[in-house]
């Protein structure tokens, strides 16, 4: 039986005061529930201190493909490990679209994260134009293939995949539970052709305007194993409700 994992992606939000209040609300409410928050780099030390000894894990939203060196402004996987990170998001649609990250670069970041002992949350998903053109499966397959070709199918036993239809991120539009399940089933089936055991054990999160009101219906789908939560992860009551829906 696969466990479910809900991870909050704070994106470029937060302040020391806001974070302290949010974490203070989340920590007791989520005791014993597997969940995580992926926070901006400057707040990793704060989160490490605040969440020490709790069941909440934490991580980052991006990582360099390089181990160390003259790469001004970059942050390496080993640095994230120093701050107690368990997870790091790679290939988020905002990184792919706004910063031009290619499938090859995402694969390199994924491998750098794993080499340091982090669990990458690999994001895949299609745009509205791609969905309307009927190429959702081809797009998702291409994004997965880049990682499998570079790191091998066995590497996915130490990773999480998040399916995020780009057209549903921050738009208020949500893929219907059936639409989401269809893509999750495609992902698992595609990977099962390469390694059935890895595919069966893989956590595949859904990301895209998940909120308390729709979480239970999404989490009830057989191949949806939690969520990668954006805006709702900044609201304690919403995030707790989503985590509890996944834990049922």
Swiss-Prot record:
PROSITE patterns: TIM_1, TIM_2. Involved in the gluconeogenesis. Catalyzes stereospecifically the conversion of dihydroxyacetone phosphate (DHAP) to D-glyceraldehyde-3-phosphate (G3P). InterPro entries: Aldolase_TIM (IPR013785), TIM_sf (IPR035990), TrioseP_Isoase_bac/euk (IPR022896), Triosephosphate_isomerase (IPR000652), Triosephosphate_isomerase_AS (IPR020861). Substrate binds at residues 9-11, 170, 209, 230-231. GO terms for molecular function: triose-phosphate isomerase activity. GO terms for biological process: gluconeogenesis; glyceraldehyde-3-phosphate biosynthetic process; glycerol catabolic process; glycolytic process. Homodimer. It comes from Thiobacillus denitrificans (strain ATCC 25259 / T1). The active site is at 92 (electrophile), 164 (proton acceptor). It is found in: Cytoplasm. The gene is tpiA. Its main location: cytoplasm. Pfam families: TIM. Pathway: Carbohydrate biosynthesis; gluconeogenesis; Carbohydrate degradation; glycolysis; D-glyceraldehyde 3-phosphate from glycerone phosphate: step 1/1. GO terms for cellular component: cytosol. It comes from the Bacteria. This is Triosephosphate isomerase.
């Amino acid at each position: 039986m696969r466990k479910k994992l809900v991870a909050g992606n704070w994106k470029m939000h937060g302040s020391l005061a806001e974070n302290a209040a949010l974490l203070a609300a989340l920590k007791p409410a989520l005791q014993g529930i597997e969940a995580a928050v992926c926070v901006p780099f400057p707040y990793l030390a704060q989160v490490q201190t605040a969440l020490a000894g709790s069941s909440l894990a934490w991580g980052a939203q991006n990582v360099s493909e390089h181990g160390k060196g003259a790469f001004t402004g970059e942050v390496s996987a080993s640095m994230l490990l120093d701050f107690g990170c368990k997870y790091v998001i790679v290939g988020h649609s905002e990184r792919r679209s706004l910063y031009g990250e290619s499938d090859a670069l995402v694969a390199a970041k994924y491998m750098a994260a794993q080499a340091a002992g982090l669990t990458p949350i690999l994001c895949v998903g299609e745009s509205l134009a791609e969905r309307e053109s009927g190429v959702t499966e081809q797009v998702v397959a291409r994004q997965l293939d880049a990682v499998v070709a570079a790191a091998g199918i066995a590497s996915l036993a130490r990773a999480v995949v998040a399916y995020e239809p780009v057209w549903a991120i921050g738009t208020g539009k949500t893929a219907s539970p059936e639409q989401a399940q269809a893509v999750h089933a495609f992902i698992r089936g595609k990977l099962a052709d390469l390694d059935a055991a890895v595919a069966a054990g893989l956590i595949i999160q859904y990301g895209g305007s998940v909120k308390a009101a729709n979480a239970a219906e999404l989490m009830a789908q057989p191949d949806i194993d939690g969520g990668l939560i954006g805006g709702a992860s900044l609201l304690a009551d919403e995030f707790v409700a989503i985590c509890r829906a996944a834990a049922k």
